[in-house]
Curated annotation (Swiss-Prot):
CDD domains: TIM. GO terms for biological process: gluconeogenesis; glyceraldehyde-3-phosphate biosynthetic process; glycerol catabolic process; glycolytic process. The active site is at H98 (electrophile), E169 (proton acceptor). One of its GO terms (cellular component) is cytosol. Substrate binds at N12, K14. It comes from the Eukaryota. It holds the Pfam family TIM. The lineage of its organism: Eukaryota, Amoebozoa, Evosea, Eumycetozoa, Dictyostelia. Its EC number is 5.3.1.1. The keyword Isomerase applies. Homodimer. This is Triosephosphate isomerase. It comes from Dictyostelium discoideum.
Amino acid sequence: MTGTRTFFVGGNHKMNGSKSMLESLSKGMNESVENKENVDIFIAPSYPYLEFLSNKLDNKKFKVCSQNCYSVAKGAFTGEISANMLVDLGIPYVIIGHSERRNVFSESSELITKKTKYAISLGLTVILCLGELLADRKSNNTEHILSEQLKDFASFTPEEWSKIVIAYEPVWAIGTGAVATPQEAQDTHVFIRKWISEKVSEDVAKKTSIMYGGSVNADNCHNLSKQSDIDGFLVGGASLVASDFIAIIKSAVPKKY
């Protein structure tokens, strides 16, 4: 990692959690994690808890992130939330394009691009998720899939890219206990950075942080974080328990600094 990129550790709670769990999590994090320059730590709780968690976490140390948002400001879109609402709540980050949105809810790359552009236009930082299925990995189709997921972002300006953090999550590793080897993850991150360099600019490629996600825990993040193109972790189940998530933060961050 170069000195120009921020290292991110994020927790995606998905459809999990409760007020009592978040109370315990925020207490543990507030007491046990210190500020570190060039490191951003965020939690993405379920929607009903966004403001609750924001009021509990030390906002000087941590950020709260939404798990999704829609591509317009308001309207007859039952069950959706808008980037405008997140801004109104003071939520600075939003995850867009997670594999569960793509594969379970059939969100297209076109919609994901629209949502990203709109969120960025309101000043939100977008955690843009990419990733391939196991069949794609086995058929050596990973680079093609990632290129297809990225292609519409070639037209984004450097200013827009400055509000994007990539999260590479091989779908076959999410929640399965399987994890890409450090070299596999590094090679894929290098490909993503090369794509950005060729399609957008070399400067944007150097500055864009690329996180890894997929069954990350305190044990495997040691070696993953040593890779030069891995700029953080998007953590799932292990972010639900304070001690587990804190262990990942304390295990990963020192390896970079």
